[in-house]
């Protein structure tokens, strides 16, 4: 792990800082934007042959020309030019890359409590001095003005356990009498607050370690502490009651959470305890527990662990170390949900390789080399590793399944917290065929969370995050299949608090790689830049709608907006303008054709049949269609629009697109034009326009490609029928159509898993099929009112 002082990380707490954070941009109010986009007299026609460079240029000006008054007061100077906007993004990306690539053992804030226990270790050479004097110095330098020690976020449990421990450490070496006095006064004046403390925010092992600290304080003769206070006596009683329920020999048999608080357990058989020591020398990654073990055993592995933790944490000790697994997994999760992971693909690959290397058959814990695993880190690991193509066995979750069918964060859990079960739910949604443990996990997690929400009993003891409950509610309403990337990001901006999140362990702590304001600042700037470009593309789409007389085919502008939204919410990157435009146009033109062929008009049935056949079998000869057909207004408009759609590309791409449309026409003629063929056409079009096919048309006949095409066709045809009939049935967070669910799982498996034998098709090609399928599922799952809200959030709502 790099020094905690690197990258401007302060040592108390170790949280990332930037002298000039990226500006938060604000777009004009929605009413202005909406009116501007929908009133043709508000702007000059752009012409439907607009190109990517033109859009990008106008977008840069849009982002950069914001008034200074629109920029938050605390985020530095206003961004006024395209160069400044791009520079802000580039600086933030560079900063985050450096942060991630120097993560090492993971960054975590120093814990006063653990630092105090380590400070008690006497010099190994027998001198009357601490072995780790830097810990004593850290304590002396980090007392708060009110006499307490702890996180700036006030919680009486955190302040009491930290302050008691710091007072004991200072008194043990008879230094800083003034600080001891202030600390004692704080405890005496505030201990009564424990009676009304928020039980959900009680620090881990509080009732186990407090009596042990108090006994040490008594032995040191510290005067003035409220030893006889009723609340203190109650804590002693609670500890006795809890420990009486645990068989004495259990602690020696296998790793349990008791190893995290050895300093609070009293007499132990240390020979047996040492057999449960982790490979890095720690006891469940706890510096305080390991320090106590060293004081009892003088074990050299314990010492090496403590020495390493103190050296890498600015002279203090965190509440847990290392946090390499925890930091990496949650950092990836945050970057993905904020919509900025594309900037950090090499770093994410590096992180996931590390997680894969330390993975065990029972999962993982917050730090590597731990015999103990928990469902939180394991669930997050399963989801992210599977999502990125790693071959991971979800049966690790069986380790957390109890005899009654319930899942628990770890054995012996007294109160089940919400966030680990929510992460279990997230992992369980990424299910491949035959993964029964994930089916069981889905049902349990969904019902557990729904019941807790319904009864207003959501309890969270691992993190203090203001909007966690809202995040969970949304996650249950919007499962992974029905979530589009930019919709997820738009909502996550509301929930992600950056450095405002506080984590709960033995003490409160901060995680810069997880909770980082620069992440959000970069995400907001990027979202606004993308949104501005999407708005200009929407202007262009409206011009195309008018010039192509799309309305005459019974297609409303709102339907056009939905088609464009699905594209923009899925492939949102600024450089993918061409793909977004083709996505929306392909959906609309295919509907125009079906509308023309199905509605009564001036053409006879025989003429329409002739036109239909010529479309399907002689696309290259569109100009040769007889004059009778061209003379019909709608037929002429349709032919012109269709021809323009194909001719916007080079000859070879146009040739490939014509082939894709020919296949679609054949299926339409065979009566398969009810969604499935549309999805297949869309996936083929996107892969062609993105250059994935290029001069290698053999890909189109590859076994994986044809299987994906077939699955996408079949699933999306069924989803279209469901959408039309509005009969999507959901139970326990899963659709009741088991056949379709199994097909969806097969598609996801084929897309995400890397081919074991090699020779598979490019991952980006496969991802296109998943993206298209998810938009069909999205439309079948969500009501129109919900979709309207999402359209507003993604395309028009300013993000600040």
Curated annotation (Swiss-Prot):
GO BP, one annotated term: gibberellin biosynthetic process
Query: What's this protein's family per the entry?
Result: Belongs to the terpene synthase family. Tpsc subfamily.
Indicate yes or no for the key word Isomerase.
yes
* GO cellular component entries: chloroplast
Q: What is known of its domains?
A: The Asp-Xaa-Asp-Asp (DXDD) motif is important for the catalytic activity, presumably through binding to Mg(2+).
Q: What class of enzyme is it?
A: isomerase
Q: What is this protein called?
A: Copalyl diphosphate synthase 2, chloroplastic
**Binding residues annotated for Mg(2+), in chain numbering:** 374, 376
Enzyme Commission identifier(s): 5.5.1.12
Pfam families membership: Terpene_synth
């Amino acid at each position: 792990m790099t020094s905690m002082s690197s990258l401007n990380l302060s040592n108390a707490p170790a949280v990332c800082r930037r002298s000039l954070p990226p500006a938060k941009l604000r777009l004009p109010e929605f009413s202005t934007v909406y009116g501007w986009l929908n009133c043709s007299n508000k702007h000059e026609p752009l012409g439907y042959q607009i190109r990517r460079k033109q859009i990008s240029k106008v977008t840069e000006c849009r982002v950069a020309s914001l008034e200074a008054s629109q920029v938050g007061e605390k985020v530095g100077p206003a961004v006024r030019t395209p160069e400044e906007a791009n520079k802000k993004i580039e600086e933030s990306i560079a900063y985050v890359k450096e942060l991630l690539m120097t993560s090492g053992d993971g960054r975590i804030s120093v814990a006063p409590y653990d630092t105090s226990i380590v400070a008690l270790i006497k010099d190994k050479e027998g001198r009357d001095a601490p072995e780790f004097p830097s810990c004593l110095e850290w304590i002396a330098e980090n007392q708060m003005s009110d006499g307490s020690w702890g996180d700036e976020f006030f919680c009486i449990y955190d302040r009491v356990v930290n302050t008691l421990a710091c007072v004991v450490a200072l008194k043990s070496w008879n230094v800083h009498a003034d600080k001891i006095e202030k600390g004692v006064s704080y405890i005496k004046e505030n201990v009564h607050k424990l009676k009304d403390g928020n039980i959900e925010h009680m620090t881990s092992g509080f009732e186990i370690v407090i009596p042990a600290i108090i006994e040490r304080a008594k032995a040191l003769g510290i005067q003035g502490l409220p030893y006889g206070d009723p609340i203190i006596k109650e804590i002693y009683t609670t500890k006795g009651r809890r420990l009486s329920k645990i068989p004495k020999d259990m602690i020696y048999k296998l790793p349990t959470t008791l190893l995290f608080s050895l300093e609070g357990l009293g007499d132990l058989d240390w020979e047996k305890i040492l057999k449960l020591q982790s490979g890095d020398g720690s006891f469940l990654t706890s510096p305080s527990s390991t320090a106590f073990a060293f004081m009892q055993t003088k074990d050299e592995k314990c010492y090496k662990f403590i020495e390493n933790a103190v050296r890498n944490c600015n002279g203090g000790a965190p509440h847990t170390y290392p946090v390499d697994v925890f930091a990496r997994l949650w950092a990836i999760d945050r970057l993905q949900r904020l919509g900025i992971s594309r900037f950090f693909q090499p770093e994410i690959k590096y992180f996931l390789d590390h997680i894969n290397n330390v993975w065990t058959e029972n999962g993982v814990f917050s730090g590597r080399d731990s015999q103990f695993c928990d469902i939180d880190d394991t669930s997050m690991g399963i989801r992210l590793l599977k999502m990125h193509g790693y071959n991971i066995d979800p049966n690790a979750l069986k380790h957390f399944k109890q005899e009654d069918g319930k899942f628990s964060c770890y054995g012996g859990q007294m109160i089940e917290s919400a966030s680990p079960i929510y992460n279990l739910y997230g992992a369980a949604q990424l299910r491949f065929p035959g993964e029964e443990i994930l089916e069981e996990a889905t049902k349990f997690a969904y019902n557990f969370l729904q019941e807790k929400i319904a009864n207003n009993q959501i309890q969270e003891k691992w993190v203090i995050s203001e909007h966690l409950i809202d995040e969970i509610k949304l996650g249950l309403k919007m499962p992974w299949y029905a979530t589009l990337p930019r919709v997820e990001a738009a909502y996550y901006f509301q929930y992600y608090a950056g450095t405002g999140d506080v984590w709960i362990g033995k003490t409160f702590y901060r995680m810069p790689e997880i909770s980082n304001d620069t992440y959000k600042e970069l995400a907001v700037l990027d979202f606004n830049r993308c949104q501005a470009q999407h708005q200009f593309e929407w202007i262009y789409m409206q011009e195309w709608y008018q010039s192509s007389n799309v309305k005459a085919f019974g297609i409303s502008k709102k339907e056009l907006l939905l088609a464009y939204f699905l594209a923009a919410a899925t492939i949102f990157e600024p450089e993918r303008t061409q793909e977004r435009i083709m996505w929306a146009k392909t959906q609309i033109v295919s509907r125009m054709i079906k509308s023309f062929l199905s509605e009564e008009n001036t053409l006879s049935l025989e003429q329409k049949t002739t036109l239909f056949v010529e479309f399907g079998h002689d696309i290259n000869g569109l100009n040769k269609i007889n004059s009778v057909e061209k003379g019909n207004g709608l037929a002429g408009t349709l032919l012109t629009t269709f021809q323009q759609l194909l001719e916007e590309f080079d000859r070879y791409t146009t040739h490939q697109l014509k082939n894709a449309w020919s296949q679609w026409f054949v299926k339409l003629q065979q009566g398969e034009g009810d969604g499935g063929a549309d999805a297949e056409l869309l996936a083929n079009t996107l892969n062609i326009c993105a250059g994935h096919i290029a001069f290698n048309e053999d890909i189109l006949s590859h076994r994986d490609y044809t299987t994906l095409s077939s699955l996408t066709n079949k699933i999306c045809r069924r989803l279209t029928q469901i959408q039309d009939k509005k009969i999507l049935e959901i139970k326990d967070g899963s659709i009741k159509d088991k056949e379709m669910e199994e097909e969806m799982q097969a598609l996801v498996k084929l897309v995400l898993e890397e081919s074991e034998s090699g020779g598979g098709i490019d991952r980006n090609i496969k991802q296109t099929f998943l993206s298209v399928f998810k938009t069909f599922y999205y439309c079948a799952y969500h009501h129109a009112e919900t979709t309207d809200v999402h359209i507003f959030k993604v395309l028009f709502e300013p993000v600040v």
